[in-house]
UniProtKB/Swiss-Prot annotation:
The lineage of its organism: Bacteria, Bacillati, Actinomycetota, Actinomycetes, Mycobacteriales. It comes from Mycobacterium bovis (strain ATCC BAA-935 / AF2122/97). The gene is mprA. Phosphorylated and dephosphorylated by MprB. It is found in: Cytoplasm. Signal peptide: none annotated. Member of the two-component regulatory system MprB/MprA which contributes to maintaining a balance among several systems involved in stress resistance and is required for establishment and maintenance of persistent infection in the host. Functions as a transcriptional regulator that recognizes a 19-bp nucleotide motif comprizing two loosely conserved 8-bp direct DNA-binding motif repeats separated by a 3-bp spacer region. MprB/MprA up-regulates expression of mprA and pepD. This is Response regulator MprA. Pfam families: Response_reg, Trans_reg_C. The modification 4-aspartylphosphate is found at residue 48.
Amino acid sequence: MSVRILVVDDDRAVRESLRRSLSFNGYSVELAHDGVEALDMIASDRPDALVLDVMMPRLDGLEVCRQLRSTGDDLPILVLTARDSVSERVAGLDAGADDYLPKPFALEELLARMRALLRRTKPEDAAESMAMRFSDLTLDPVTREVNRGQRRISLTRTEFALLEMLIANPRRVLTRSRILEEVWGFDFPTSGNALEVYVGYLRRKTEADGEPRLIHTVRGVGYVLRETPP
């Protein structure tokens, strides 16, 4: 059964972007547009984690945190906010948030922080079973280890995020814009060849010993992870 995450933000574009990204990565996602709706949804069907904006109408994110913690609820909470001062971060943590992420942010970082929050609430053996595999390629989001067969591959943060997205969606064609949004974040570049450059890096590293290519170009669309060319 997939992990259920409740995303609470009054900005519809942010809600939908997070829904797409989290769903793409195997989470079951529900949406709320303010704190009152969020508390009602949590009371009726408690999720596994909460992604919570601070500035919202009716009931803001900090008050949601306070109300949950006052009842003894230890639901993992990741707070999002456009304010990034020390005092704002302290206020969020003091209200009961487990982690704090300022906007704008890279979706890659939000996913990493969510994995870290969930690891804290799961037994050790559950965390150890998160390795992702395709063909002879293995990626572990917990240890951040990547292997092609028995060969260890060292990746940068961006290379890892790109490969993680591909391996989470085997044989599914991912559009260029979708990859840019998820790996580079909301302020992703609309021009330039950053994506092509990083795909080239990944290919060189995953094919360094002459292994067959797994990352293929779908001309005019994007990229796909599969055993044979599309």
